[in-house]
């Protein structure tokens, strides 16, 4: 059992003097789990982390998804080292970016053409620009609770009604920008149709997480994505899939291939970088030809397609092509799901568990979670206590009730067995303090 975080606490105190909030992304703070100093990690290997105090953890954060092959995978590490030795940035085309683009196209048939950028945020931001250029329209639709990066246009919350215009979800986002966004609930065809009937003639595109990953793991209802495509295309708008989380997470390729639904444009990130910063977007040839230098939609980047990220991404996909990896993730995910549910029943803890293959979310509620409203109405205080109990057990989770647990190819059955035992001890402690 982990008993001390002395160095993490001291480091956080020092970080607060120099870094805003002591963290470089707000999701890393412990604000959503009752506060305290976030645990500072020193190194990772395989499915494990070691913090600055020397405590070891089984890692289910996986850097919020990208680290599907585990930490410091030797094939990826070797590729990064070689790229670094050859120079990390040229500002010119390279053979690596061509090879990687071909690999992505082969894995995801909806990508006629691709363009590399530096983050998922940038990828989504640019698909919106391209969709606007192609359609000549300005408004964007999105689903409530789905996170598409931190650019102004997508930091928008729903208005007072299901088919109203949005309101800013962050200080610094002008109301004028929020007025270009319509937010509707996920998995609700009728509300989507209502919004399109009202605003469809002004909509350039709809942003879709084909499998939601930002208020936990939530799958679309049967036929929902097909209906989205039908209704949006009837309105003359484009369908953009944000596969920053989902691509290569559930199968080799995208969620669009897993679910059999094809978008017009796709945004990628996270897993495809093998742990290094990356983003990419792509889609139908006639739409992508809106992008400069062929078309009028401008997008550029000094670091875009840099050799280190290209080499890391290629190596990651090469690992993921190995036979049986995704089957292993599904098998371990099923084992973990079964064990958590058994422990919840044993200790009379109310949970709902959503899982798809090697990713899952534990919600402290008895309600079914199919949309953001349902995810919001779960017990965040109980999750915060559970999170800290699991940390004491040496199990690292994301510090938010909305985030997923991500398995990696390096987790073992022994890791899952230990985690289930740790969950049992945490649930027992929660039950004792009800």
Curated annotation (Swiss-Prot):
Pfam families: Aminotran_3. It is found in: Cytoplasm. It catalyses: (S)-4-amino-5-oxopentanoate = 5-aminolevulinate. GO terms for cellular component: cytoplasm. Its main location: cytoplasm. Keywords: Cytoplasm, Isomerase, Porphyrin biosynthesis, Pyridoxal phosphate. PANTHER family: GLUTAMATE-1-SEMIALDEHYDE 2,1-AMINOMUTASE, GLUTAMATE-1-SEMIALDEHYDE 2,1-AMINOMUTASE 2. This is Glutamate-1-semialdehyde 2,1-aminomutase 1. It comes from Bacillus anthracis (strain CDC 684 / NRRL 3495). The gene is hemL1.
């Amino acid at each position: 059992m982990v008993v001390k975080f002395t160095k993490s606490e001291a480091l956080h105190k020092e970080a607060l003097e120099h870094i805003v909030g002591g963290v470089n992304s707000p999701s890393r703070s412990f604000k959503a789990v009752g506060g305290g100093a976030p645990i500072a990690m020193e190194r990772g290997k395989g499915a494990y982390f070691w913090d600055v105090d020397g405590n070891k953890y089984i890692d289910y954060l996986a850097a919020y998804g990208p680290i599907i092959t585990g930490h410091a995978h030797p094939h990826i590490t070797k590729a990064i080292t070689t790229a670094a030795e050859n120079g990390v940035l040229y500002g010119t085309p390279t053979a690596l970016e061509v090879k990687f683009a071909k690999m992505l196209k082969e894995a995801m048939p909806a990508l006629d053409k691709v363009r590399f950028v530096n983050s998922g945020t940038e990828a989504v931001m640019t698909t919106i620009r391209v969709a606007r250029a192609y359609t000549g329209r300005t408004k964007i639709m999105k689903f409530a609770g789905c996170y598409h990066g931190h650019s102004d246009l997508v930091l928008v919350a729903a208005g007072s009604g299901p088919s109203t215009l949005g309101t800013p979800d962050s200080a610094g986002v002008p109301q004028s920008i929020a007025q270009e966004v319509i937010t509707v609930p996920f998995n609700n065809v009728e509300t989507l149709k209502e919004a399109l009937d009202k605003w469809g003639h002004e909509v350039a595109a709809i942003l879709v997480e084909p499998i939601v990953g930002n208020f936990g793991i939530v799958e679309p209802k049967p036929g929902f994505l097909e209906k989205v495509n039908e209704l949006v295309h009837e309105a003359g708008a484009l369908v953009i899939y944000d596969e920053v989380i989902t691509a290569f997470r559930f199968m080799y390729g995208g969620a669009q291939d897993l679910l059999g639904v094809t978008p017009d444009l796709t945004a990628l990130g996270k897993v495809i970088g093998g742990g290094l910063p990356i983003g990419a977007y792509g889609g139908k040839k006639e739409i992508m030809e809106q992008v400069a230098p062929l078309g009028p939609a401008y997008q550029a980047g000094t670091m875009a397609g840099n050799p280190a990220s290209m080499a890391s991404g290629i190596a990651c996909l090469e690992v993921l092509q190995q036979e049986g990896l995704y089957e292993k993730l599904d098998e371990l995910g099923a084992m973990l799901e079964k064990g958590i549910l058994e422990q919840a029943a044993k200790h009379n803890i109310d949970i709902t568990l959503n899982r798809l293959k090697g990713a899952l979310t534990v919600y402290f509620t008895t309600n079914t979670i199919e949309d953001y409203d349902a995810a919001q109405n779960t017990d965040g205080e109980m999750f915060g206590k559970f999170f800290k109990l699991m940390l004491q057990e040496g199990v690292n989770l994301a510090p938010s009730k909305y985030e997923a647990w991500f398995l990696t190819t390096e987790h073992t059955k022994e890791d899952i067995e230990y985690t289930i035992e740790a969950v049992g001890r945490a649930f027992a402690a929660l039950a004792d303090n009800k």
